[in-house]
């Protein structure tokens, strides 16, 4: 079975072709921020990214008619259980409207549906374990204020895939195991997996958990309040400090850990301190 996979990121799109479990090829397109910034919304990037992916297929000599199934990265939908979901019009409308948040992952389902259509409708299109997977136990939803309920937004696809892989290595299924799984990318999320369900997880998009290359993580609430009411920043600027321009970007001006390691090797004591702090915070969350 030929499976075409589409993973849109903020400034990139990764695509891959699989024959069952075997990867045939994969490619990552990277876009200049100047190009992406010209689009007024995530949804308005759909046509651009579709055409760019078509260029890869042309280079590979592959037609969408060859695909049996197409899987797009799941975006910010209403909370749902983990699993595989077939893409439909309502899902696409919800994602493109950014009703539950704006993120490049919202383009995964629309792009998958576009390529299914381009292939003449032979292939079915799906998303798997989107970032809004919500399997929290009731206690995990409670914060210290009744007006604020915790929500589940995390790297569900990666976390659940790693849990399945770990269980398989032990000759078990995830239903037989309990894990703590840490995803460490531009954002960091740490989840408690109980027999296949993620019953609690740090929500890096809402400012929980450890800092990461691009996110602030949890901050002292009092000092954050002072920053918010200082009159120096708009709401959008504060949000940018929490997600996108926090963490390593805020401290060191880069989200590239390879660059940070080079600085440490060259004797940059500040880079070493911040790197140790990031590791410490992830360890503490685990």
Predicted regions and their residues:
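Gly/Ser/Thr-rich active-site cleft segment
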Residues: 100-162
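Adenine-nucleotide phosphate-binding core of ATP-dependent small-molecule kinases
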Residues: 240-286
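Short glycine-aspartate micro-motif
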Residues: 2-6, 67-71, 179-183, 189
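N-terminal phosphate-binding loop and adjacent alpha-helix
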Residues: 27-65, 91, 95-101
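Short beta-strand-loop/turn "lid" adjacent to the catalytic site in phosphate-handling enzymes
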Residues: 57-104, 124, 132-144
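Phosphate/pyrophosphate-binding loops at sites that engage ATP/ADP/AMP, CoA/4′-phosphopantetheine
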Residues: 55-68, 168-173, 286
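Short glycine-rich, Thr/Ser-proximal phosphate-binding strand/loop in the N-terminal lobe
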Residues: 3-44
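Glycine-rich phosphate-binding loop of actin/hexokinase-like ATP-binding domains
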Residues: 140-230
């Amino acid at each position: 079975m030929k499976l075409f996979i589409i993973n849109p990121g903020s400034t990139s799109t990764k695509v891959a072709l699989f024959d069952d479990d075997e990867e045939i090829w994969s490619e990552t397109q990277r876009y200049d921020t100047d190009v992406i910034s010209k689009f007024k919304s995530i949804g308005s990037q759909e046509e651009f990214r579709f055409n760019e992916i078509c260029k890869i297929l042309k280079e590979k000599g592959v037609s969408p008619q060859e695909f049996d199934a197409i899987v797009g990265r799941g975006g910010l939908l209403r909370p749902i259980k983990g699993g595989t979901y077939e893409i439909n019009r309502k899902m696409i409308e919800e994602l493109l409207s950014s009703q539950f948040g704006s993120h490049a992952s919202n383009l995964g389902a629309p792009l998958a549906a576009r390529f299914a259509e381009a292939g003449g409708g032979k292939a079915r299109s799906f998303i798997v374990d989107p970032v809004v997977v919500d399997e929290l136990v009731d206690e995990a939803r409670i914060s210290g204020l009744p007006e604020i309920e915790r929500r589940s937004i995390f790297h569900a696809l990666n976390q659940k895939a790693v849990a399945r892989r770990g269980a398989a290595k032990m000759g078990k299924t995830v239903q037989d195991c309990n894990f703590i799984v840490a995803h460490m990318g531009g954002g960091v999320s740490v989840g408690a997996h109980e027999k296949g369900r993620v019953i609690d997880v740090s929500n890096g998009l809402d400012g929980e958990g450890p800092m990461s290359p691009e996110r602030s993580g949890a901050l002292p609430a009092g000092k954050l309040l002072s920053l918010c009411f200082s009159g120096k920043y708009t709401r959008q600027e504060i949000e940018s400090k929490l997600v996108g321009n926090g963490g390593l970007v805020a401290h060191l001006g880069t989200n590239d850990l390879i660059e940070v390691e080079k600085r440490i090797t060259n004797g940059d004591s500040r880079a070493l301190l911040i790197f140790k702090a990031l590791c410490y915070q992830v360890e503490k969350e685990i």
